[in-house]
Amino acid sequence: MLELGEQPYTEADAEWDAFVAAHPHGSLLQTTNWARLKNRFGWTSQRVWLRRDGRLVAGAQVLFRSLAFGVVKMAYIPHGPLADWDDEEQLAVLFNQIDQAAYRRGAGLLKFEPRLWEDECPPDQWAALYRRHGGAPSADTIQPPRTVVVDLRPSEDDILAAMKQKTRYNIRLAEKKGVTVREGTAADLPAFNRLMAASLLCLRSGQRWS
């Protein structure tokens, strides 16, 4: 029998983080530390979970933030919920619990982006899954929808040879213009922060780097 629960992120942190770490789709974005970080930037956090025989089996760390001058509140689940996506009963109970939690917090929009590979859940199955649980797929994503995994064991020449010609051209062009790559340290954080701020400004204004 499934037991439902809801709690602020500050409670039972160790148990929740252990659940996230052990889950096959677990992510930094569902951890206590991520909730603490987001809370510093205007988000609030709530956890919804399911237990079976006293053990956590599914759940979601939901982030909330007001949009449009406080008129609308958004509920967002990055890289979640964490669940057994083949267990329809579990998913139905979990999404109902999430919907209720979002409603109680005044959210007018719920967005979730599970950390699933396409071979686990192809796009057509995604669409059906969203609709079964009251949602709809969206092309507007917050988290990067794709990840590139590169095997670093071959030689550099072999790795480059496996890339598209345009990619190789851009890499060599950057080298000719003096671009270098190195591992950063804590001393680089201020410069990185300035770069991120400038990138965000360009994104919001529609300008391009020059």
Stretch-by-stretch model annotation:
Residues L2-V71, P114-C121, A128-S210:
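A conserved beta-strand-loop-helix scaffold within acyl/acetyltransferase catalytic domains
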Residues G70-D140:
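Acyl-donor binding region in acyl/amide transferases
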